[in-house]
Amino acid sequence: MVQAIVRSSAHIGLSLHRNFHSMKRTILNLFVFVVCVLTGGMLNGIIVKYSSAIVPPPIGFDLTTEEGLKAAMTVMEPKHFIMPFLAHAIGTLAGAFLVTLFIKERKLFRALLVGFLFFLAGCYMVFVLPSPLWFDALDLGLAYIPMAWLGYKLAIRFSK
């Protein structure tokens, strides 16, 4: 009887240790995931912020505010949409690459989850900031999920 109680309590202790280890790994994975998404988002923001140095905005318009962007949208040419597209694509690619590199399990799922989160942010921007339909289709179709998949593939190749 005593031996059964000792074995049972040892089993419970081992079970608690495994659960703690699993919870610790889950929290660490969540932290790494959030940091990677934020890193991709910051890279996106940096590219957008400094894009006017590469492609000057239309004359007389301030693209640093939402109102300025809305006002300039009717006079913007396709060249003005290159940098926002690249910012979205590179930010997503970087976030998915980093997630794949640093998280040990379910890499593809997590990389695509990064792409999906960025895709949701892109959908939000489509509703908030009216832009040409061709840009919305290109951006939503190519800058998020495909770039997350590419980030995953590059990280797998890089880590070999």
Model-assigned labels for residue ranges:
Residues 21-160:
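Juxtamembrane/disordered regions of integral membrane proteins
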Residues 7-22:
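Short, Lys/Arg-enriched N-terminal segments with co-localized hydrophobic residues
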